[in-house]
A protein has these predicted regions:
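Residue-level signal for secondary-structure boundary elements
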Residues: 22, 115, 119, 171-175
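Active-site flanking loop/helix segments enriched in acidic
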Residues: 11-35, 59-61, 69-75
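Short N-terminal micro-motifs specific to bacterial/archaeal maturation
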Residues: 1, 24-27, 81
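Extended, non-globular alpha-helical segments
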Residues: 1-12
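Divalent metal-dependent catalytic cores for phosphoryl transfer on phosphate-bearing substrates
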Residues: 37-165
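Charged phosphate-binding loop/patch that engages nucleotide di/tri-phosphates or the phosphate backbone
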Residues: 165, 169-193
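Residues that form generic nucleotide/phosphate-binding pockets
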Residues: 13-17, 93, 106, 166, ...
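Aromatic-acidic/polar surface patches that form glycan- and anion
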Residues: 29, 83, 176
Length: 193
């Protein structure tokens, strides 16, 4: 598939499957994804960071047949709220489409980033929504000291935390942001790299 065809496939998937509730939050999954990308674009002009923000929950949008295919090849399907392992499934799906290691790692890390931030920033954990606090229990709770040190040794750990903070802010009822087509060119650039 060309970058344009892949972008069309992704934008169609988000549009057609994004109208459902965003688990425990007062907005749709699509609105959440668009807001996350909007907040990422306010922080950075880096297309990989912005595209990862837009697609961070793509594992929630995939049809069951795609999830079953991907899940068979994914090593770790640790528990989660919503679709189990959606961050891992989404990262693998994007890798198969041709996205860079950085995009896929940012997507894969948005759940563990919450665990890291809860362990290292008291104000962060105090600011989480009720639904996000509830999901934290299922995601393993705050990281241990050894997990925190390991996290800090990983690639792009600061960007992973920034993306997570965009994710947490992206729950605003009625916030007007750009639509899906706003991100087509960035998606195509990420695929053409």
């Amino acid at each position: 598939m060309s970058p344009n065809e892949t972008a069309t496939q992704l934008l169609t998937l988000l549009s057609s499957h994004g109208q459902g509730d965003y688990i425990g939050e007062p907005i749709s999954q699509l609105a959440h994804s668009l807001q996350c990308a909007h907040f990422a674009a306010q922080q950075s002009s880096d297309p990989e960071f912005i595209v990862a923000a837009l697609l961070h929950d793509i594992g929630q949008f995939l049809p069951v047949s795609d999830v079953q295919s991907i899940a068979g090849s994914v090593q770790s399907m640790s528990g989660n709220v919503g679709r189990v392992g959606h961050e891992t499934i989404g990262a693998e799906y994007l890798r198969r489409l041709g996205f860079s290691k950085r995009v896929t790692e940012l997507v894969a890390a948005h759940v563990p980033a919450k665990r890291f931030l809860c362990a290292t920033e008291k104000a962060y954990s105090e600011g989480l929504s009720e639904a996000s606090m509830a999901s934290l229990k299922f995601q393993g709770g705050p990281m241990s000291e050894s997990e925190v040190e390991e996290w800090k040794g990983g690639e792009w750990w600061e960007d992973k935390c920034r993306l997570r903070k965009c994710d947490d802010c992206a729950k605003v009822v009625g916030l007007e942001v750009g639509g899906l087509e706003t991100y087509r060119e960035r998606i195509e650039r990420c695929l053409g790299a």
